[in-house]
């Protein structure tokens, strides 16, 4: 059937579709061209025209006409023309076979059912719920996080997991476990004297409302010594040695006015409480004495007349000041000591001054 179908289609299908004239119109031009170009080729052209399809038949006839220029050539080309005409049904057979195979495949194809694998996921969820208890999904986000696990659970070594399993509770290691909050509360309940480690008598239970004001003591006695040193000096800006001696030795006269006589001997210098309080000021006065321009050795060059006059003028001024403050017995004692002062001034030596300085420094 396939061979008959191919033969019918080769002659009748394409010429009717391409040209309305059919085979008669196509054979005549092919035969005329073959006669004009060559006799031997005419038969080949005719055969090619009959076996061709559509427009290709005229071209095959022309090709056969060209080849038919001589008898030997036409005889050689003739089998080629027949072979070309017979190749068309072979092509049709292959097309028909492929079409039939496609029809068979379509007929035998059946749709495959899609099997859902949701059951195995449900089984896993049921197992998890049975192990951890009933929990609704989506109700609490913390439940989902706990089921997923921490970020460290996926990246821990086996040794770390063993450490977690071996870790003991804080109750077992009670000696190393300290609750800081309870410790702070216990310390706050203790009294203040125990917390500060101080005697209970030194800690005041209540805070005083008014704090007593403390006024510092002002020592005006030292200022008197400084003012006395800044008094009138001798000629040339240098005071006599006995004047300096009397200033330092006459401290009891200025501070404690019970003994107004400035005696140069060591027996007359008795320590009193004002002297101890003015110890710091004495050091300052000693620095002033050492910084004076006149050295101690120049005291020998001073004339006795000048020293006696200066002593008398100074003693007169001291007597005037003491008369206003002191009683009459003190004035009589000064008059008794006046004749002794010039004699003692002459007996002042460098050794006594050095001893006096040493006593002041010590």
From Swiss-Prot:
BP GO terms, sorted:
apoptotic process; negative regulation of apoptotic process; negative regulation of G2/M transition of mitotic cell cycle
| Keyword Membrane applies | yes
Please list the residue ranges that the record marks as compositionally biased, kind Basic residues: 8-17, 50-60
- Top-rank lineage group of the source organism: Eukaryota
Q: How does it sit in the membrane?
A: Peripheral membrane protein
Q: In which tissues is it expressed?
A: Highly expressed in testis, ovary, thymus, prostate, spleen, small intestine, colon, heart, skeletal muscle, liver, kidney and pancreas.
What keywords does the record list, in alphabetical order?
Apoptosis, Membrane, Methylation, Phosphoprotein
- Modified positions (N6-methyllysine) in chain numbering: 230
Where Phosphoserine occurs, the residues are: 94
Compositionally skewed regions (Acidic residues) per UniProt: 90-105, 350-362
InterPro entries documented for this protein? Aven
**Location(s) in or outside the cell:** Endomembrane system
Residues annotated as region Disordered? Answer: 1-111, 214-237, 253-362
Report the GO terms under cellular component. Answer: cytosol; endomembrane system; membrane
| Residue ranges, compositional bias (Gly residues) | 37-47, 61-72
Q: How does it assemble?
A: Binds Apaf-1, BCL-2 and BAD (Bcl-xl).
Purpose of the protein: Protects against apoptosis mediated by Apaf-1.
Q: What is this protein called?
A: Cell death regulator Aven
């Amino acid at each position: 059937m396939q061979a008959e179908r191919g033969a019918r289609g080769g002659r009748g299908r394409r010429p009717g579709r391409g040209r309305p004239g059919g085979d008669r119109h196509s054979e005549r031009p092919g035969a005329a061209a073959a006669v004009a170009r060559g006799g031997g080729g005419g038969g080949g052209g005719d055969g090619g025209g009959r076996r061709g399809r559509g427009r290709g038949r005229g071209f095959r006839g022309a090709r056969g006409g060209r080849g038919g220029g001589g008898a030997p050539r036409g005889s050689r080309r003739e089998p080629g023309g027949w072979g070309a005409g017979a190749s068309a049904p072979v092509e049709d057979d292959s097309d028909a076979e492929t079409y039939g195979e496609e029809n068979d495949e379509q007929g035998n194809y059946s749709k495959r059912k899609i099997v859902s694998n949701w059951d195995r996921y449900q089984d896993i969820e049921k197992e998890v719920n049975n192990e951890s208890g009933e929990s609704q999904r989506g109700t609490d986000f913390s439940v989902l996080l706990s089921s997923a696990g921490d970020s460290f659970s996926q990246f821990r070594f086996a040794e770390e997991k063993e450490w977690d399993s071996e870790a003991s509770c804080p109750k077992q290691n009670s000696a190393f476990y300290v609750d800081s909050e309870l410790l702070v509360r216990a310390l706050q309940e203790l009294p203040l004297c125990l917390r500060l480690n101080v005697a209970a008598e030194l800690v005041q239970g209540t805070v005083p409302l008014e704090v007593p004001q403390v006024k510092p003591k002002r020592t005006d006695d030292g200022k008197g010594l400084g003012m006395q040193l800044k008094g009138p000096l001798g000629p040339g800006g240098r005071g006599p040695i006995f004047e300096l001696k009397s200033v330092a030795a006459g401290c009891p006269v200025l501070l404690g006015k019970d003994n107004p006589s400035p005696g140069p001997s060591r027996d007359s210098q008795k320590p009193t409480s004002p002297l101890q309080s003015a110890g710091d000021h004495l050091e300052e006065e000693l620095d002033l004495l050492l910084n004076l321009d006149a050295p101690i050795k120049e005291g020998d060059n001073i004339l006795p007349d000048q020293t006696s006059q200066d002593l008398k003028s100074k003693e007169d001024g001291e007597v005037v000041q003491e008369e206003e403050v002191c009683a009459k017995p003190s004035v009589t004692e000064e008059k008794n000591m006046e004749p002794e002062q010039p004699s003692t001034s002459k007996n002042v030596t460098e050794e006594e001054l050095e001893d006096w300085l040493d006593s002041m420094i010590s």
